[in-house]
Swiss-Prot record:
Principal subcellular localisation of the protein: cytoplasm
Annotated residues for binding of ATP: K610
Lineage: Bacteria, Bacillati, Actinomycetota, Actinomycetes, Micrococcales
Database matches in PROSITE patterns: AA_TRNA_LIGASE_I
Name the UniProt record assigns to this protein: Leucine--tRNA ligase
Length: 842
């Protein structure tokens, strides 16, 4: 059952329509009553007038693939706690919502349904929007946006043009990751274990002319600026990004490729982290699928190379780099000259070297690199050890040696250690003019072309006379055509937009001659790399965002979303932010000051999936237990970064607690505004300690512990009402009002109703965080539990400083204890002052 707002025929609305009995907790009645009140009061719309300090809280916006699921329920409950807490603390909070609404699933659905992707997309958005409203997310709905709206992607195209003008968007021919099922290109980050991240099909290589963003120009800054995020982002996310960027210090070494009868001499540069091992190079390898291989191969070897390249196309990157696979390759007929010793090295083309990493060529040192050694063994190439590590000769063992050691067989480098040999080798290369120190990165430029329809069109026109011509700003957005739908969108290996002849054929903006639009669309990660900026002023028409407002809100103070976005979205968003800053449009250097990764929602220890049949329908859970009970369960079940196993939690238990908390309001008999100072001291101490503890815990995202403290306060308040000072005590009102405010972060419907019952106008969301009194945090007494033979027989209020002897005396004097002993003697008394006395009868 899907998550739906209450309707006239819905179960929840029907229950709400029947007025609940007085004093009966009805989540359905509350869910029917309060949403319209919140909307009318614009409770969650920030003033944005500078009257209060601003805070920006953002959840990673969803993709509209059907209705909300359990993962959405957890993630958005977490983000909402942060937004509601900051609002209670007096900040002007921006907490917007929108949809990442371009993408392949919509296109596939349109093909299946003979429809336009927008129909499926916006229908799902409407469904999810209604569900979010039922789920009581404290979002400012006036800022809602969708990346597939022309009003949004106009500015995505505008930003692309600014990148293009700075040389950060460019086209090149290169082997790219190709999904043979979706018939589209994939970025490196979208290939997981050699397969398409989306559909799981093994990825192949294909040579295409594609658009790229030059993210490598920002590699150093992306790496260095992580220092600003240390302690505010999860360490594992920072580690994943550092590894993906992959900074390596080493050297560029230039090898001369000898001329042949029909090939001129040329120079090829390689990057190596171990220039000290140059004397161990016994052959040279270029990526078989690189243009360099075609440039180098002799006519005699050409056909063999071409046949080999066809085989390489069918291999994934993971397969090509595997150490388990037998090495393959083709001799090019050429030789490279080692710049240090003049030795001729045969040049091979092989699949284990990648065209788009480094320069696409390597010097092979088989004694000290396992893949080089495996290749040498396969093709009978020499193996020369130049590093004495104390291990056996790799030529004999078949196991390469690496790491520390003393250089040998290395001319003037003999006897040097690794730390001495690397700078010495670089110095020699620099003197010879054949190399220099260089920093390389694993990170490669961001491939953004996609051969699909439902994405942002690339705002470039191709003219036979003028070449690439950006679409003028006043002609943006380049809108997607409306007349392509259904089967016309099916993947054919070229962009579906090519079939929209009237759309494609245009005049060149420069010369007026016949020209064609670019028919690729942008990777949808482009859309999500700047959406957080648009939320600041989503209706602004003079630019991507209002320059008068953007620096008031950015950077995002708290970003919430899954760790699966650690490399793709988060790295791209950081890149975009830095470029936009360099353009001079914003001051922020990083998009997200703090990051919270919520765990997964599992069922029976496994991720929910249709194939396993272990999915849990969120709508059914909401109908059965209520929104507040589900939200509270999500938050209380574990620390936010840990997984929640729905099989092990109890939304029914949460519902019972909420009913207990709500009933406190029915019992309070004092008037609003009564002075709590005259109230029960013990309850006031619990209340003020809860307020103080909750604030500190919330500041550290320990939401589950806050709920535990809240439960203790509810129990203490009930005890005071039933067996202590009574419902009229001012301390009871103070406690219940604190319960309502703290509860509003987790269970907004129940909290609002409780606040209303206490005589306050809506909304509790703006009540303000209660102030604690430090004097009340010092406990005058503590409760000592007295047990007789392991059973609790009495509780004594005693000084925190009571001695063991004094506590023993009080316990033995207790009438309840004497009654339990029933005249028996005492074998022993165990005292743990000030909390416990255990009496063991004789």
């Amino acid at each position: 059952m899907s998550v739906k707002p209450e309707t006239e025929t819905g179960t929840a609305q029907t229950a709400a329509a029947e007025a609940p009995e007085e004093g009966v907790y009805s989540f359905a009645a509350m869910e029917a009553k309060w949403p319209q009140v919140w909307e009318d009061l614009k409770v969650f719309t920030p003033a944005d007038d500078g009257s209060r300090e601003r805070r920006y809280v953002l959840d990673m916006f969803p993709y509209p693939s059907g209705d909300l699921h359990m993962g959405h329920a957890e993630a958005f409950a977490m983000g909402d706690v942060v937004a509601r807490y900051l609002r209670q603390k007096g900040f002007d909070v921006l907490h917007p919502i929108g949809w990442d609404s371009f993408g392949l699933p919509a296109e596939n659905a349109a093909i299946k349904r003979n429809a336009h992707p927008s129909e499926w997309t916006y229908a799902n958005i409407d469904t999810q929007a209604a569900s979010f409203k039922r789920y009581a997310i404290s979002a400012d709905w006036s800022r809602r946006l969708h990346t597939s709206d022309p009003e949004y992607y106009r500015w995505t195209q505008w930003l692309f043009k600014r990148f293009y003008e700075r040389g950060l968007a460019y086209r090149k021919d290169s082997p790219v990751n190709w999904c043979p099922k979706d018939l589209t290109v994939l970025a490196n980050e979208q290939v997981v274990n050699g397969a398409c991240e989306r559909c799981g099909t093994p990825v192949t290589k294909k040579s295409l002319n594609q658009w790229y963003f030059k993210i490598t120009d920002y590699a150093d800054r992306l790496l260095e600026d992580m220092d600003q995020l240390q302690g505010h982002w999860p360490e594992r996310v920072l580690a994943m990004q550092r590894n993906w960027i992959g900074r390596s210090e080493g050297a560029h070494v230039r090898f001369v490729i000898e001329a042949t009868a029909d090939r001129a001499e040329r120079e090829v540069t390689v990057f190596t982290t171990r220039p000290d091992t140059l004397y161990g190079a016994t052959f040279f390898v270029v990526a078989a699928d690189a243009h360099l291989a075609l440039d180098l191969v002799t006519p005699e070897q050409h056909d063999e190379l071409m046949a080999y390249r066809e085989k390489v196309k069918a291999l994934s990157e993971i397969e090509r780099q595997s150490t388990e696979r037998e090495k393959t390759g083709v001799f090019t007929g050429r030789y490279a000259i080692n710049p240090l010793n003049g030795e001729k090295l045969p040049v091979w083309a092989a699949d284990y070297v990648l065209a788009d990493y480094g320069t696409g060529a390597i010097m092979a040192v088989p004694a000290h690199d396992q893949r080089d050694l495996d290749f040498a063994k396969t093709f009978g190439l020499p193996v020369r050890a130049v590093l004495d590590t104390g291990d056996e000769d790799p030529a004999e063992t078949g196991v390469a040696t690496a790491g520390e050691g003393t250089l040998k067989n290395s001319g003037e480098l003999d006897g040097l250690s690794k730390s001495e040999g690397i700078p010495a080798a670089i110095e020699i290369l620099e003197k010879l003019g054949t190399g220099e120190k260089f920093v390389n990165f694993r990170l490669r430029d961001w491939l953004l072309s996609r051969q699909r329809f439902w994405g942002t069109p690339i705002p470039i026109i191709h003219c036979g006379e003028c070449g690439e011509v950006p679409v003028p700003d006043d002609q943006l957005p380049v809108r997607l055509p409306d007349d392509l739908r259904g089967e016309a969108l099916s993947p054919k290996g070229t962009s579906p937009l090519a079939a929209a002849v009237e759309w494609v054929n245009v005049e060149c903006p420069n010369c007026g001659r016949a020209a064609q639009r670019d028919t690729d669309t942008m990777d949808t990660f482009v859309d999500s790399s700047w959406y957080f900026l648009r939320f600041v002023s989503p209706d602004y028409t003079e630019g991507p965002f209002d320059p008068e407002k953007i620096n008031n809100w950015m950077p995002v103070g708290q970003y919430v979303g899954g760790v699966e976005h650690a490399i793709l979205h988060l790295l791209y968003a950081r890149f975009f932010t830095k470029v936009i800053k360099d353009i001079g449009l914003i001051e922020a250097n990083e998009p997200f000051s703090a990051l919270l990764n919520q765990g997964q929602v599992l069922n029976g220890g496994k991720a929910m999936s249709k194939s396993l049949g272990n999915g849990v329908d969120l709508g059914e859970q909401l109908d059965k237990f209520g929104v507040d009970a589900v939200r509270l369960t999500m938050v209380f079940a574990s620390p936010p970064e840990d997984d929640v196993d729905w099989a092990d939690v109890s939304p029914s238990g949460s519902a019972k607690f909420l009913a207990r908390a709500w009933r406190l309001g029915q019992d309070v008999s004092s008037e609003p505004g009564v002075d709590p100072a005259t109230g029960d001291r013990a309850l006031r101490t619990v209340t003020h300690k809860t307020i103080a503890d909750a604030a500190e815990l919330l500041d550290n995202n320990k939401f589950n512990v806050v709920v535990a403290r809240l439960m203790e306060l509810v129990n203490a308040t009930r005890k005071t009402i039933d067996s202590g000072a009574g419902a009229a005590d001012p301390a009871v009102r103070e406690a219940v009002e604190a319960v309502a405010v703290i509860l509003s972060l987790f269970a907004p419907y129940t909290a609002e109703d409780l606040w209303n019952t206490l005589g306050h106008p809506a909304s509790v969301a703006n009540a303000g965080w209660p102030k604690h009194d430090d004097a009340l945090l010092v406990q005058d007494t503590v409760t000592a539990v007295v047990q007789v033979q392991g059973k609790v027989r009495d509780r004594l209020e005693v000084s925190p400083d009571i001695t063991e002897d004094a506590l023993r005396e009080l316990a033995l004097a207790s009438e309840n204890v004497q009654r339990a002993l029933d005249g028996r003697g005492i074998r022993t008394v165990i005292v743990r002052a000030p909390k416990l006395v255990n009496i063991v009868p004789a």
